[in-house]
Amino acid sequence: MTLLVWEGKRPADDASAARYFTDLYDRYIDTEEPAVPPVEPIAACVAALLERWPDLTEDEGDSSPWSTGPLIGEAGGPLVYFPMRWSMAEEASAYAAEVAASMGLNCFDPQARKLRP
C-alpha cells in the first residue's frame, strides 16, 4: 500500500487529486533528472512519522510500517510517497493522514483513488 502527501492547494475532488498526484510523481519521483530535496513541510511530515515508527533502515524489532528506507528518500520537492507494509498499512495510513492534515498538507490514497480527510 502507498500513501501520497504533498504541499499545495487542495484539489477540488478525487479525480483532480489523482491527476495532480500523477503530475507531481512524474516530475519529482519517477524521473531521470537530479533529485530535488523535499520542501520543509514535507521533511517535517516525514520527521513526525519517524518519531512514531523507526525508519526501515533502523528497524531492529520489525516495528516499522514502511516498506522502503530511508523514508525521506521517497520525498522530492513538494511530494512524499509512503510505501507501507500491508500488515500495518491501516494504522500507519490513518496516522500519516492525520499528521499531514495537521500540517496543512494534502493526502491521497492511490489504491482507493481518494483524498484522505
Protein language model regions, located:
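Acidic (Asp/Glu-rich) sequence patches and key acidic residues
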Residues: 1-117
